[in-house]
Amino acid sequence: MAEQLYATLKTNRGDIEIRLLPNHAPKTVRNFVELATGQREWVNPETGEKSTDRLYDGTVFHRVISGFMIQGGDPLGNGTGGPGYKFADEFHPELGFTQPYLLAMANAGPGTNGSQFFLTVSPTAWLTGKHTIFGEVSGEAGRKVVDAIAATPTNPRTDRPLEDVVIESVVVETR
């Protein structure tokens, strides 16, 4: 069996193991892995300074919508931040939002991917062709963590959790 690439989001609510899909979205997976491991330079939106810090460590899931998705990856933690660059979408004909627990890029329209991502908690077919899918939650334990985060009480105006859900670190490994 061929080796697979995994990213584990270690959160204050438990671990979410994700099987990444580099054969379907190679640029997106590379961007995510390099930001997660400190191998890609990014610009801190708060200071304007270049950084090779691990972007996702210490960030929060800033937007949580029960029955839909959980969103994170913003270095500012409010939905407005990113890495200081944007890149194109990668849509693969074999991938659509026909099942829950998919990892995809959040964006503000075509070609605006950066660092923000979301995990779905239900099929969301209307997102197919609008957001790059680049992974899927690989096990029942991680799916339960995603579901628990999605059920977190939020501010009804902003969809932000009332208590921070923190991505403490991201571990990337091939196995």
UniProtKB/Swiss-Prot annotation:
Its main location: cytoplasm. InterPro entries: Cyclophilin-like_dom_sf, Cyclophilin-type_PPIase, Cyclophilin-type_PPIase_CS, Cyclophilin-type_PPIase_dom, Cyclophilin_A-like. Coiled coil: none annotated. This is Peptidyl-prolyl cis-trans isomerase B. It catalyses: [protein]-peptidylproline (omega=180) = [protein]-peptidylproline (omega=0). It is found in: Cytoplasm. The gene is cypB. It comes from Streptomyces anulatus (Streptomyces chrysomallus). GO terms for cellular component: cytoplasm.
